[in-house]
C-alpha cells in the first residue's frame, strides 16, 4: 500500500504558492499512490458547503481531478470542521472521523484532541462541534458566516499569542492513552505545526506533520515504512 498523508495547509487563496503546490502535488501523486489522507485544516476557514468563493471553486476542481485517480480521505481540523456531505459528494473525497484507523496498527487524527492542557481550546472545540451550534450557524447567511469566521481567526491568533507554548503541544499522557486504547503501533497527526518523528514507550512511533508555511510537508507510507518529507513551496512540486 502506497499512502500519502498531509495536514495544516491552511489554504485561503487559489493563487498562493501553497495552493499551487497542493494542486501540483495532487496531480503528480494521485497517479502514483493508492490513497491520500488530508488530516485536517486543509483550508484556513470553511463556513459551509455553499461557499462559492474562488478558493472553494478551485479546491473542488483540484480534488475532483485527484479522486478520479486515487482515493482521497479528508478529516476535519479545527478550521474546516464544517466540511459536510455536500462537499464530499461534489469533490469525491471520503470524510473520515478523528481517530481513524486505516490499518489495525495505524492511527490517524488531526491532533487537537491531544492538546488536553489547553482547556480553553477544548471547551471551545466542544461547543463548535455541537450539533445545535452548527445547525444555528449554518442557518445564517453566507456573509454572516464569513464575518464570524474572520473574527474567529483574529481572536484565535490573539489568544494563542498569549498562551504558553507547552499547553498548545500534544500531551504525553493523551498520546499514550489513544495509542493504547486503539492498539496502534504508529500515530500520525498534525495541528501543532511541530513536524518530527518521535518514539513512544520505546516500541511505538508518533509522526507529526508540519504546516505548509516555510515548506510543504508530507508523510509517505510504502508497505510498513514511513518517511517524513519536506519540499519547497517556491518552485513547482517535484522539481
Q: Model regions: which residues?
A:
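Short, charged N-terminal helix-start/capping segments
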Residues: 1-17, 108-123
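Active-site neighborhood of phospho(di)ester-bond hydrolases with catalytic His/Asp-centered motifs
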Residues: 6-7, 36-41, 72-78, 108-109, ...
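N-terminal short leaders/motifs
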Residues: 42-63, 156-184
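Short acidic/polar alpha-helix capping motifs at helix-coil junctions
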Residues: 25-28, 65, 137-143, 181
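Active-site-proximal loop/helix segment associated with metal-binding centers of metalloenzymes
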Residues: 109-171
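Conserved histidine-centered catalytic loops in small-molecule metabolism enzymes
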Residues: 231-239
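Conserved beta-sheet core of the metallophosphoesterase superfamily
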Residues: 94-97, 103, 107, 112, ...
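Core catalytic region of metal-dependent phosphoesterases/phosphodiesterases
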Residues: 2, 11-103
Amino acid at each position: 500500500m502506497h499512502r500519502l498523508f498531509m495536514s495544516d495547509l491552511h489554504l485561503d487563496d487559489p493563487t498562493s504558492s501553497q495552493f499551487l503546490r497542493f494542486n501540483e502535488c495532487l496531480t503528480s501523486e494521485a497517479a502514483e499512490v493508492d490513497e491520500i489522507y488530508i488530516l485536517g485544516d486543509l483550508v484556513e476557514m470553511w463556513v459551509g458547503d455553499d461557499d462559492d468563493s474562488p478558493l472553494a471553486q478551485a479546491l473542488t476542481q483540484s480534488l475532483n481531478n485527484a479522486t478520479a485517480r486515487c482515493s482521497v480521505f479528508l478529516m476535519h481540523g479545527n478550521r474546516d470542521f464544517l466540511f459536510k456531505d455536500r462537499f464530499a459528494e461534489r469533490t469525491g473525497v471520503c470524510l473520515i472521523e478523528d481517530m481513524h484507523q486505516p490499518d489495525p496498527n495505524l492511527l490517524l487524527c488531526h491532533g487537537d484532541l491531544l492538546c488536553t492542557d489547553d482547556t480553553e481550546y477544548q471547551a471551545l472545540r466542544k461547543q463548535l462541534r455541537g450539533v445545535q451550534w452548527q445547525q444555528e450557524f449554518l442557518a445564517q447567511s453566507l456573509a454572516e458566516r464569513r464575518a464570524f469566521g474572520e473574527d474567529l481567526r483574529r481572536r484565535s491568533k490573539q489568544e494563542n499569542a498569549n498562551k504558553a507554548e507547552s499547553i498548545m503541544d500534544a500531551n504525553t499522557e493523551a498520546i499514550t492513552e489513544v495509542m493504547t486504547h486503539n492498539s496502534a503501533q504508529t500515530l500520525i497527526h498534525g495541528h501543532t505545526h511541530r513536524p518530527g518523528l518521535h518514539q513512544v514507550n520505546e516500541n511505538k512511533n508518533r509522526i507529526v506533520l508540519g504546516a505548509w508555511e516555510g515548506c510543504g510537508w508530507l508523510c509517505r507510507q510504502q508497505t510498513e515504512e514511513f518517511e517524513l518529507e519536506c519540499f519547497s513551496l517556491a518552485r513547482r512540486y517535484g522539481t
